[in-house]
Amino acid sequence: MSRPQGNKWIGIAAVSGFCAVMIGAFGAHGLESVLSEKMRANFETGVRYHFYHTFALLACGILHVIHPSKLLEPAAICFLTGVVLFSGSLYVLAITGITKLGMITPIGGLAFLAGWITLLLHTIKPPQHPAKER
């Protein structure tokens, strides 16, 4: 991941954070009286994991600037995929009640886990410094 790649993931994290706040506010104020308690809990779980993994995306971007690694891009992709599949499926499930969407949620959870493992590998693998120009 080059420095612009790190900045790209910081930008994506900013958009994700904005969306998490907006979706959370919509759930708390716009859906409060519409959703059942169970569906509201599903929605809130989606928002919570959306926030957690927005910070993970941000960490991938910042880490790249400090300690570059080819592993940070795949980790960030996994976190973003997890947000879309895990949180996104919970949002749609809560609003529409389509329970078949619940089958997508674990795939998003696996993407989150893959992101965390890849980030762990980044801490274990020695940094890959580009050759210095002479």
Give a label for each model feature.
Residues L63-T99:
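Mid-chain, well-packed structural core segment of small domains
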Residues R3-G17, L71-F79:
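Interfacial segments of alpha-helical transmembrane regions
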Residues S16, A20-I23, C60, G82-S89, ...:
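Membrane-embedded alpha-helical transmembrane segments of multi-pass integral membrane proteins
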Residues G30-S33, H67-K70, T96-T99, H122-H129:
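Juxtamembrane transmembrane-helix termini
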Residues I12, C78-T81, I104, A111:
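Physicochemical signature of membrane-embedded alpha-helices that form the seven-helix bundle of GPCRs
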Residues A28-N42, S89-L110:
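Interfacial helix-loop-helix junctions of multi-pass membrane proteins
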Residues M1-R3, P127-R134:
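Short, charged juxtamembrane terminal tails flanking transmembrane helices
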